[in-house]
Amino acid sequence: MKPPQRRRRVPARYVGEATGPTAWSPREMRHLLRLLQARRGQPEPDAAELAQELRGRSEAEICRFIQQLKGRVVREAIQKMQPGGREGPRHQGTPLPAPVEVWMDLAEKLTGPMEEALTAAFSQVLTIAAAEPLSLLHSRPGKPTKARGKALVFLSNQDGQKDPASEGSGPVPMTAADPTREASVSDPKASGANPETSGLASEVTVPDPDAPTKSLAGSSTERDLAVDFEKIYKYLSFSSRGGHGPELSAAESAVVLNLLMALPEELSHLPCTALLEHMTKTYAQLMAPQTALPGEKRPRPGTEDGGTGSTGPEEPDQASPQASEPIEPRLAWKAVGICPLNPFLVPLGLVSQAPSPSR
């Protein structure tokens, strides 16, 4: 006997109704209004006190609703103070919003009900990257791993001779390859005394020809020079969720700062023309008015206010297996509305470095 049909459900972390706040009923709003009127003399209402008398609502929900009320009061006051709205005389000289502000507003509309899922997924990507073998190889000191990388070519010393550590045969694990390493000149005597530590001595010696070369000693100094990329990834993962990550050393903080400072330079290496065409096309599609398909019984959420058509999942009857259209891979995300980590559906080839003409 054929079993009954089982309707597939979207995970709760991707459903807008599950992650978003529930709507306030008129009874709850009237009750909250009476509570606020009774506390009219207070400068700021206490959310914890209101939550005790308003059953079924948490402190965060009450604070969020009060902020919405404040925003509505501000908008009404602005409309009274500035007659004519945006067409009035005071708005004629108002500058247009910057492009980044337009994209940020559109991204908030797309990922509003899924912000928690997006943040968790982005944090998981950084957590997985912390366990990559290359992260362990590039750390200083290196961590034990079965992966092997290419041998690093160290800088030559004053005599023009290569470092003995780079002349070894066979692949060796990379010890340190981070942006914080600076070129420093080592003493020939110190570099020839111990071939195994000459590569490290060339990095930590003082570039003063008059003073004798000495290796940095002390646990505090070694801790400042240590670079653990696993800790850096964990720090970025905690920061993306608004938490407090592990404390970074001086060298690790320099790596994070160098990554942030290198972002403007990396933008010039992207295929800007193709990326511009894709973003322009995507913006036009998202802002275009959505028309209901013949098989749909009701429009998708979000088509009334912003025209994005991607602010929430579809109704369950639209995702039923009785649909006549052929099942395509992209329909898996259609039930969700958007891809959490890629709301603008940018191809991965457009976020990699474009080949230069010299290559």
UniProtKB/Swiss-Prot annotation:
Biased composition (Basic residues): 1-11
Organism: Mus musculus
Keyword field contains Transcription: yes
Annotated region described as Disordered, given as residue ranges: 1-22, 157-221, 291-327
Keywords: Nucleus, Transcription, Transcription regulation
Gene: Snapc2
Functional summary from the UniProt entry: Part of the SNAPc complex required for the transcription of both RNA polymerase II and III small-nuclear RNA genes. Binds to the proximal sequence element (PSE), a non-TATA-box basal promoter element common to these 2 types of genes. Recruits TBP and BRF2 to the U6 snRNA TATA box.
GO process annotations (BP): snRNA transcription
Subunit description: Part of the SNAPc complex composed of 5 subunits: SNAPC1, SNAPC2, SNAPC3, SNAPC4 and SNAPC5. SNAPC2 interacts with TBP and SNAPC4.
Subcellular location: Nucleus
Name the UniProt record assigns to this protein: snRNA-activating protein complex subunit 2
Predominant cellular place of this UniProt entry's protein: nucleus
KW Transcription (keyword) present: yes
